[in-house]
UniProtKB/Swiss-Prot annotation:
The gene is dsbD. It is found in: Cell inner membrane. GO terms for molecular function: electron transfer activity; protein-disulfide reductase [NAD(P)H] activity; protein-disulfide reductase activity. It is a multi-pass membrane protein. Gene3D superfamilies: Glutaredoxin (3.40.30.10), Thiol:disulfide interchange protein DsbD, N-terminal domain (2.60.40.1250). Belongs to the thioredoxin family. DsbD subfamily. InterPro entries: Cyt_c_assmbl_TM_dom, DsbD_gamma, DsbDN, DsbDN_sf, Thiol_diS_interchange_DbsD, Thioredoxin-like_fold, Thioredoxin-like_sf, Thioredoxin_CS. The keyword Nucleotide-binding does not apply. The chain crosses the membrane at residues 178-198, 230-250, 254-274, 296-316, 337-357, 368-388, 397-417, 420-440. PANTHER family: THIOL:DISULFIDE INTERCHANGE PROTEIN DSBD (PTHR32234:SF0). Disulfide bonds join C124-C129, C193-C315, C495-C498. Residues 199-229, 275-295, 358-367, 418-419 are cytoplasmic. This is Thiol:disulfide interchange protein DsbD. The keyword Transmembrane helix applies.
Length: 579
């Protein structure tokens, strides 16, 4: 009996002690209290400014926030001032969430008072998730805010400043900085962008049947440089006036083909196949005037300088891109003209010095002049190969170079004498011709060498980019970015450095490993369409290749832009600083 009494006493005591456990019920805030929402309209009616006050312990999903105008299919992109946090969610896995207040911007045209905007968002707390919440806002009912939210710009990291941005940003601190472009041009003269101009200048000065004197050589070189400077000056004026990137236009396939035909014609004329001259009737009228001049080739030197400027400018380098960006941002015609003129003048000074000092050590004129003239004909033929390789399929580049090199070595061997040192050079030239002809043999006989099969049958890179067509699609894609950063690659089929990025940099295993944590986007700029131009104007893109990086708020990371080719190691280190 005592045991039975003790048993019931313990049972009732346990129920009494734990009665509060069954009576207690966990309560959650209402959705409007957990995520207090408000919205205003900017004074220019281009921004709908949204604000969420998030209660402690609650969070909003970044990818669940959306907005659209009622009756229109295009969603509005969101740009937030706060960074999202990574959160391990029991329902969705690893997601990006906001745990504090949010200030966001929806861009659009909110001019019609009767238009309505639907804003949808969803949040959770520990142990409980709210269904998606939708707010329908009438534009005419929104309060107009005098304070316009400015999109957040990530602070500049000097370790990440590209050469282009350093140049463009630093130039605004000094009115005299434009004269630094003269020094910049001196260095740029020794880059691959300008090297093709040296043979052209030499062909004009020493490729004559008569040996030019010092004054004539200087005059021809000076006019050549002034022609080149005029091209760059006009380029600076155009960029300053309308801000459009003319490098893209100059790299259009039609322009490349036209320049190639021009240089082939010039090369053939140097081989003696024909003579390029004015019609006889016009030439006779100009004979009297030309006889008064030191030579009739001065106009040709000036014109060739202009052409050389066009050939060099499509080769986008970081200094030239920075100069154009500086000019575009200044919007001043005088600054644009002087900046590019000084750049071209600096590039031309080494050419003039080389011409003058080279001319002094030349031997007396003779048959060797025809050999030199024909040699420069081959140099001119190299320019069409270089230009056409940008627009032809990749397999054609080695074939064109092989054909040109083979013909050159055979021709060079035939120029050598059969005695002594000349005979040795002849044998070496024929041997080199046998080596350079191999790509042509592979093509003709369809033998699959390792190099050819690698180019034609194997993918260059396993990297998969999401293709973007316009700015609207870019904004939508960035808003849904599941990674910490996004990369936008501006690519074109005619861009040599773009192909080098794909073949040499993006294919690197270390770079591909880093790409797993980056949203990879790509825009084809091949056709230079209106959508392409809109993207270039929005991001001040001056040429290709250009690679942009964006943060979690869909803003370009200041100083992270890459212009010009970068090898795998350098590019990997660049990305490492961003991740």
């Amino acid at each position: 009996m005592k045991k039975l009494f003790l048993f019931f006493t313990l049972i009732f005591t346990a129920f009494a002690a734990n009665s509060g456990l069954f009576d207690k019920k966990q309560t959650f805030l209402k959705v409007d209290d957990a995520f207090a929402f408000s919205a205003t309209l900017s004074t220019d009616k281009s921004q709908l400014q949204a604000h969420w006050d998030i209660a402690d312990g609650y969070y909003l999903y970044q990818d669940k926030i959306s907005a659209e105008l009622v009756g229109k299919s295009n969603p509005l992109s969101l740009h937030t001032q706060q960074a999202a946090e990574l959160h391990q969610d029991p329902y969705f896995g690893e997601v990006k969430v906001f745990t504090h207040s949010i200030d966001g911007i929806f861009r659009g045209a909110f001019n019609n008072a009767d238009d309505k905007v639907e804003i949808t968002y969803q949040g959770c707390t520990e142990g409980f998730c709210y269904p998606p919440e939708t707010k329908v806002l009438r534009i005419g009912d929104l309060v107009v805010s005098q304070k316009q939210i400015v999109e957040k710009t990530v602070e500049k990291n000097t370790a990440l400043l590209s050469e282009q941005d350093r140049l463009a940003d630093g130039l605004f601190h000094s009115k005299w900085a434009i004269f630094g472009f003269f020094v910049l041009g001196l260095g740029l003269a020794f880059t691959p962008c300008v090297l093709p101009m040296l043979p052209l200048l030499s062909a004009i000065v020493i490729g004559q049947q008569q040996r030019p004197n010092m004054m004539r050589a200087f005059s021809l070189a000076f006019l050549y440089v002034q022609g080149m400077a005029l091209t760059y000056t006009l380029l600076g004026l155009a960029v300053a006036a309308i801000g459009l990137p003319f490098q893209i236009a100059l790299q259009h396939p039609y322009v490349m083909i036209g320049l190639s035909i021009l240089f082939v014609a010039l090369a053939l004329s140097m081989f003696g196949l024909f003579t390029i001259q004015l019609p006889n009737s016009l030439q006779n009228k100009l004979n009297t005037w030309s006889q008064k001049q030191t030579s009739g080739a001065f106009g040709g030197a000036f014109a060739m300088g202009m052409i050389a400027g066009l050939v060099a400018s499509p080769c986008t380098s970081a200094p030239l891109s920075g100069a154009l960006l500086y000019v575009a941002q200044s919007g001043d015609l005088f600054t644009g003209a002087v900046t590019l003129y000084l750049l071209a003048l600096g590039m031309g000074v080494p050419l003039m010095l080389i011409t003058l000092f080279g001319n002094k050590i030349l031997p007396k004129s003779g048959e060797w002049m025809n050999t030199v003239k024909q040699t420069f004909g081959f140099v001119m033929l190299a320019l069409p190969v270089f230009l056409l390789s940008r627009i032809l399929p990749e397999v054609w580049e080695p074939r064109l170079w092989a054909g040109l090199a083979t013909v050159f070595f055979i021709w060079f061997a035939l120029q050598m004498s059969k005695n002594g040192f000349g005979y040795a050079i002849k044998i070496i030239s024929f041997a080199l011709a046998m080596v350079t002809v191999q790509p042509l043999q592979n093509w003709i006989w369809q033998t699959q060498t390792t190099t050819q099969s690698a180019v034609e049958n194997m993918p260059v890179s396993q990297v998969k980019f999401k293709q973007i067509k316009n700015t609207e699609e870019l904004d939508r894609t960035l808003a849904e970015n599941p990674h910490s950063i996004a990369m936008l690659d501006l690519y074109a089929d005619w861009c040599v450095a773009c192909k080098e990025f794909e073949k040499l940099t993006f294919s690197d295993p270390q770079v591909q490993q880093q790409f797993q944590n980056i949203l990879l986007l790509q825009v084809s700029m091949t056709k230079n369409s209106p959508e392409n131009k809109a993207l270039m104007e929005r991001f001040n893109v001056m040429g290709l290749p250009t690679i942009l990086f964006f943060d979690q708020q869909n803003n370009e990371i200041k100083g992270s832009r890459v212009t010009g080719f970068m090898d795998a190691d350098a590019f990997s280190n660049w990305i490492e600083k961003l991740l």
